A protein has these predicted regions:
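Cytochrome P450 heme-thiolate monooxygenase catalytic core
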Residues: 19, 122-128, 164-317, 333
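N-terminal membrane-proximal hinge/A-helix region immediately C-terminal to the signal-anchor transmembrane segment
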Residues: 2-148, 163, 167-178, 196, ...
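Cytochrome P450 heme-binding "Cys pocket" and the immediately downstream C-terminal segment
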Residues: 182, 328-330, 449, 453-491
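Conserved cytochrome P450 K-helix/beta-meander segment immediately N-terminal to the heme-binding cysteine loop
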Residues: 371, 393, 401, 406-434
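Cytochrome P450 I-helix active-site segment
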Residues: 166, 170, 220-228, 282-284, ...
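Short, small-residue alpha-helix embedded
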Residues: 312-325, 463
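C-terminal, well-structured subdomains that either form a transmembrane helix-short loop-helix hairpin
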Residues: 301-304, 310, 395, 400-404, ...
Length: 502
């Protein structure tokens, strides 16, 4: 009855109704402005210390041109570091249609990932780029779906006894050694590391290996999968670099590669499910089969886990041995330690923990070339970060809902205040007594920190130790400097071209 009377009154007072409706938007905008002002004042926020000068303040076509044409793909990460040196550790790029904050400040990154992580979520331009190519796996999920997938993955990675995993590593390492000539001829270790980590990851997580290092089968199908996977990975990164403008880019080759990737996965999953089982503990595939009802969803999760377990470890190994080959005195020092601790026998997990210099070398490679060098979040509500405001950039900065937050680990790892001088050089000794805290973030941080971190480090430490035991000399056959190939995980564009001798 009341609603009918109210509607009748509105119809009889049409002009008043229009006026009232027209006031709603400005009143809400004013209320938002006041609320944000109060939050900003309460937190002591000041205006951004550094803002990017823009030519197109509406859509940002000058930003699009800069990303597509002004930055060399092999120097993209270096250019971001140069931008921070020019603009400061936190700066703002503001348009009428969108706003982004770029930071390499450890305090801000800690705020985004841990202290106020509930204020931030995965950005749409990440989920809408990765999702259509690699599906709805753990790296694009949020909320309950993400927690569930992470719980299943944690169960797969939680191995109380590392001995069976080390046995898997040793068996695959012996297949790896057969592919490495010792007559002084050149070999690119990077694709071999890719094959090694692919075989280990699939056997460990799915109970069925791709056997890419086996000399008893044709690897055409597996190599096509690896090539297609890399095409898709590079396309994802190129689109993500465009941020909110990613929809303006399209790649037919990547779409064709995606179809072949899923066709391979469908076949491989069938082979894994039908392969003989020895009654051992469950793996990721069997755990996911119990919770994922459709084959597409299963393939999505597998693709994302391959990124976490294969790409990152192989990229780390390739980057590390690029520099070890360039610096034979470091490799000699590493080899001396490994032989002193473990002799010539395959090392145990306990012995690996005692190899201090080995861990320094791995840490230094992760510092210099973090396998996931940049990442992003979006503010889901009005919030603040502790640095970036005021003239000196040391005051809090207000972050409005919808602001894209790009945090750069690659640049953060070049902070001389945390890591000492010559941060562009590979110097493992810098890790003696070094405690960088949130200034060192090779595996992300907070609730979304890499769940397979210990798995990846154990695999890396083992392979590095076995390489040091197996080969007396490691020499570079590449006279060029390290160049980036920024796919979903960072690796050397020129590989790791070396010669070895026993």
């Amino acid at each position: 009855m009341f609603s009918q009377l109210f509607l009748k009154w509105l119809s009889e007072h049409f002009v008043v109704t229009i006026v009232l409706l027209s006031l709603i938007v400005p009143l809400r905008a004013f209320e938002t402005l006041i609320r944000r002002w109060r939050l900003s004042r309460a937190q002591g926020c000041q205006g951004a210390a550094s803002k990017v000068p823009v030519k197109d303040p509406i859509i940002g076509f000058d930003f699009l041109y800069k990303v597509l044409f002004e930055k060399s793909p092999e120097r993209y990460l270096h250019s971001t570091w140069e931008a921070f040196k020019e603009m400061g550790t936190t700066y703002v790029e503001k348009r009428w249609s969108w706003q982004a904050v770029y930071t390499c400040d450890p305090q801000n990154i800690k705020q985004i990932l841990a202290t106020a992580s509930e204020d931030f979520d995965l950005p749409e331009f990440r989920t809408s780029v990765i999702g259509p190519i690699f599906g709805q796996g753990i790296f694009v999920l949020s909320g309950h779906a993400w927690k569930h997938a992470r719980a299943v993955l944690r169960q797969s990675f939680r191995k109380d006894n590392p001995a069976p995993f080390l046995e898997t590593l040793e068996r695959n390492f012996q297949a790896f050694v057969k592919r490495v000539p010792t007559d002084g001829s050149e070999v690119d270790l990077q694709p071999l590391f890719l094959a090694l980590t692919m075989d280990v990851s699939t056997e460990f997580l799915m109970g069925h290996s791709t056997n890419m290092l086996s000399d008893k089968k044709d690897h055409t199908r597996e190599q096509q999968f690896v090539d297609d996977y890399m095409i898709c990975s590079e396309e994802i990164i190129q689109q993500m670099q465009l941020g909110p403008l990613h929809c303006l880019k399209s790649n037919r080759a990547a779409k064709r590669a995606k179809k072949r990737v899923y066709a391979y996965l469908d076949t491989f999953v069938e082979e894994s499910l039908s392969s003989p089982k020895d009654g051992s503990e469950n793996n990721f595939l069997t755990d996911m089969m119990a919770t994922v009802s459709d084959r597409k969803g299963l393939s999505d999760h597998i693709l994302h886990i391959l990124l976490a377990s294969r790409d990152t470890t192989s990229g780390l190994l390739g980057n590390l041995f690029f520099f070890l080959a360039k610096k034979p005195h470091i490799f000699a020092k590493l080899r001396y330690e490994v032989l002193k601790v473990a002799g010539e026998d395959p090392p145990t997990a306990s012995q690996l923990r005692d190899m201090t210099y080995l861990k320094w070398c791995v840490n230094e490679s992760l510092r210099l070339h973090p396998v996931i060098p940049t990442n992003a979040r979006i503010a889901v509500r009005d919030t603040t970060i502790p640095r970036g405001g005021g003239i000196d950039g040391k005051s809090p900065l207000f972050i409005s809902k919808g602001t894209a937050m790009f945090y750069n680990v690659y640049a953060m790892h070049r902070n001389e205040g945390a890591f000492g001088p010559k941060t562009e050089e590979f110097i493992p000794e810098r890790w003696q007594d070094l405690r960088p805290g949130w200034g060192y973030l090779p595996f992300n941080g907070g609730a979304r920190a890499c769940i397979g971190q210990q798995y990846a480090l154990l695999e890396t430490h083992y392979v590095v130790a076995r390489m040091a035991q197996t080969y007396k000399l490691l020499e570079s056959r590449d006279d060029k400097e390290w160049m980036e190939l920024y796919a979903l995980a960072l690796c050397s564009k020129n590989g790791a071209r070396v010669s070895v001798s026993k």
